[in-house]
């Protein structure tokens, strides 16, 4: 009887692991599909130079670049972007979106 119970536990554990692996695979496929849709949308929104600039930013600040991409796609979907965005226009957008930097001055008494 103990062997039967042990075999049942192993079978359940194996099924659970397979289900978990299948869910991870589905999540990964969904993420890849989302990324492909995002890139297609950006190709329609941005001129090549602007896309290149955004890809360069993505290398150094991936979270910031992703946020900008999402905002651009949302603007395009809402109809607020009529023409392709040029590199100069993207620079302006990036300056507006970039949080203000604080400067610290350290003064030494002596």
From Swiss-Prot:
One of its GO terms (cellular component) is cytosol. The keyword Hydrolase does not apply. One of its GO terms (molecular function) is DNA binding. The keyword DNA-binding applies. It comes from the Archaea. Disulfide bonds: none annotated. Keywords: DNA-binding. Belongs to the PDCD5 family. This is DNA-binding protein Mhun_3016.
């Amino acid at each position: 009887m103990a062997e039967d119970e042990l075999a049942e536990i192993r079978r359940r554990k194996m099924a659970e692991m397979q289900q978990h692996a299948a869910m991870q695979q589905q999540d990964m496929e969904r993420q890849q599909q989302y990324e492909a849709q995002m890139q297609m949308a950006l190709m329609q929104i941005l001129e090549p130079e602007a896309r290149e600039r955004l890809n360069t930013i993505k290398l150094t600040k991936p979270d910031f670049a992703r946020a900008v991409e999402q905002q651009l796609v949302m603007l395009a979907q809402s109809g607020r972007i009529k023409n392709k965005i040029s590199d100069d226009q993207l620079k302006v957008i990036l300056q507006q979106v970039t949080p203000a930097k604080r400067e610290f001055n350290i003064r030494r008494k002596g």
